[in-house]
Amino acid sequence: MAGGVTGGADGTWSDRFEQGLHPFIEVFNASIGFDLTLLQEDLDGSIAHARMLGSCGVISVEEAEQLVQGLETIRSEAHAGTFQPGLADEDVHFAVERRLIALLGPVGKKLHTGRSRNDQVGTDLRLWLRRRLDELEGDLQRLQRALVAQADLHRRTMIPGYTHLQRAQPLCLAHHLLAYVEMLERDRLRLHDVRSRVNICPLGAAALAGTPVPIDRQQTAKALGFDAIYANSLDAVSDRDFCVEFSAAASLVMAHLSRLAEEVIAWASEEFRFVRLSDRCATGSSLMPQKKNPDVPELVRGKCGRVFGHLQGLLTMIKGLPLAYNKDFQEDKEALFDAFRTTRDCIEAMAILFEEGLEFRTERLNTAVEQDFSNATDVADYLVAKGVPFREAYQLVGAVVRRCLDEGCLLRDLSLAAWQELHPAFEADLHDALAPQAVVAARRSEGGTGFDRVDEQLGRWLQHLNGTQPVG
């Protein structure tokens, strides 16, 4: 045919077409450059489909076994690097079918009986994403373990707590790190929840309306490990909600990683000096020899936008599509693949950073909490414990802070006599109550930063990540 190959396993769509594709359109239309990622899943789905055709009597059992052996041969060729699809194949499905026909002859042409690429690609995508979701859950737990290990080292290390990036109240460093462990646990559970909707099988929906071929959809779904089949064939081939859901869940993972990355970047700066970056996770400057740049967290923070962009792209792709399948769906794959790879890589990078790439400057951190007014709330709490109404105590302490700022001193610098001039409820135990260790230890409410509560939280997480008990 003139003008290039029109596609299909034998180089043609059908006798419906008299001319080949324009050479540019052939390239523009092809997805083989990226959907070959789905090869293993395509082979798995085709093997299950072939066996089902044989058991239902659509083809002979012998033919089904030939198809299975041919598909396994293609798998072996792929592992050996000898399976080389070309542009003429258009996509992974045609590439497999073309090679199968080359291996088996006419029997290879029977594989696609009772099936369309529409339900085939939906099945492949779900199989691929199901595996990737399982991997991401493990990756998140690795990062959680790294954070918990750091928290375990710093059960009694303190760090300034901030609101509005202003010093607020002192915290236990372990408590701060465990906040991210909690975020990541929500992410892990969210991804696990997405998996339940990924794990529904569209195979057998055919192009959009089902098939007159006497197939057994339940058999293929069970063989492939799906929990259920789509109840509506039109919905089965039209659904890309699971791609959007994954991208949304991945976006939240990235948002949490970006927040953690931003804190590491700040902590590593000369202005904070809370962490020291190792040479294995930092780079230098081509001009300024003194620099040690936090490239790892900066890249994580920067890559966050890629995953957010894929979510927006997928939402935009599906919003105006009529039922059922549309070529627009070809755009789901690169977005999905890159969202996964970016999220996975960023999780691993942050895990390495906390496993071996940074060291908390304990002395600096414990000193930092002594050099501010973050114990002001505790003065108010002290008065409340003595029977003073909170709002009265709050206003009094605010006036004291103003006085200290004017005089260039801290609350700890005021004498007991000066305190008692302000209110007779102040007693000799005040200064002990204002010490950072006492301030942190006093936060004993459940989930608080008090050392005893943090020990409880850490114990629960250590057991959970070792698989001995759930978090709760």
UniProtKB/Swiss-Prot annotation:
Catalytic activity: 2-(N(omega)-L-arginino)succinate = fumarate + L-arginine
Keyword Amino-acid biosynthesis: yes
GO biological process: arginine biosynthetic process via ornithine; L-arginine biosynthetic process
Keyword hit for Lyase: yes
SUPFAM superfamilies recorded: L-aspartase-like
Pathway field: Amino-acid biosynthesis; L-arginine biosynthesis; L-arginine from L-ornithine and carbamoyl phosphate: step 3/3
A Pfam match: Lyase_1
GO MF, one annotated term: argininosuccinate lyase activity
E.C. designation(s): 4.3.2.1
Record keywords: Amino-acid biosynthesis, Arginine biosynthesis, Cytoplasm, Lyase
Top-tier EC class: lyase
Cellular location(s): Cytoplasm
Matching InterPro entries: Arg_succ_lyase_C (IPR029419), Argininosuccinate_lyase (IPR009049), Fumarase/histidase_N (IPR024083), Fumarate_lyase_CS (IPR020557), Fumarate_lyase_fam (IPR000362), Fumarate_lyase_N (IPR022761), L-Aspartase-like (IPR008948)
GO terms under cellular component: cytosol
HAMAP family (alphabetical): Arg_succ_lyase (MF_00006)
Alphabetical list of PANTHER family matching this protein: ARGININOSUCCINATE LYASE
Family membership: Belongs to the lyase 1 family. Argininosuccinate lyase subfamily.
Record's protein name: Argininosuccinate lyase
